[in-house]
Amino acid sequence: TSPEKPSGVALITTVDGGENSIVVNSGANFDLTEADIEKAREAFKSASIVLMQLETPISALIAAANLAKGCGCYVVLNPAPAPKNPLPQELLRNVDLLIPNETEASTISGCKITDEATAAQAIEIIQKTGVKDVIITIGSKGAIAMIDGKPTLSPALRVRAIDTTAAGDTFCGALCTALINGLDMRSALAFANKASSISVTKAGAQISMPYLSEM
């Protein structure tokens, strides 16, 4: 919370076919401090996975990743929105899994992604920064990851997209849920792709995320 600013707000517009544009007023979200992270130490101690994104200050993310690793957590970073500057090594060294989309992965790696081959190339470049695992989401095609040293495409379900607003968030949340419950990466990818595919068939963000019973 912030004594001076309201919570962050996002205005989302969609067009036919489900693609969207998002305008964000970060508000209090960008007032998150390292001290705030430290106050949450007990929550980190009880967690198995910590999932982060780039809508809060980098300094707070670095503090969160450091604390998470110190507490034995698996650290996942969804680098959204696409970073304007290179992500600092002091953040990446504590990230176990990075989940960018095509645009974000292209920005981070410097490799323009046009197909599975260039996606695999981008993954290899990003892994050289110290990140152990990378999954690149590629929209309606699904997601690609290195599994057993080989680029592996996990396809999305074929659906009629109404609103893609929460697709990435749904994918990341579902993937973490699957990993917490002991699924291997290949199975976790399939679970996350299914959840994400279901989410785009409904309008809205949080309301479009499927319950486990829908899976």
Language-model-derived ranges and their functions:
Residues V23, T107-G110, S199:
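Residues that scaffold the ATP/ADP-binding catalytic core of kinase and kinase-like folds
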Residues K84-N85, Q89, E116-M215:
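Conserved phosphate-binding/catalytic region of the ribokinase-like
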Residues V9-A10, E19-I22, S48-I49, C73-V75, ...:
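Structural motif
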Residues T1-S48, M215:
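Conserved N-terminal subdomain of the carbohydrate kinase-like
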Residues T1-S7, N78-A80, I125, I135-I138:
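Beta-strand->loop->alpha-helix junctions that form or flank phosphate-binding loops
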Residues P3, G27-N29, A80-A82, T103-A105, ...:
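Short, acidic/turn-prone active-site loops that include or flank metal/cofactor-
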Residues I49-Q121, S140-A143:
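Conserved beta-alpha-beta core of the PfkB/ribokinase-like small-molecule kinase fold
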Residues E42-K45, R93, T129:
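Structured loop/turn residues at beta-strand edges in well-structured enzyme cores
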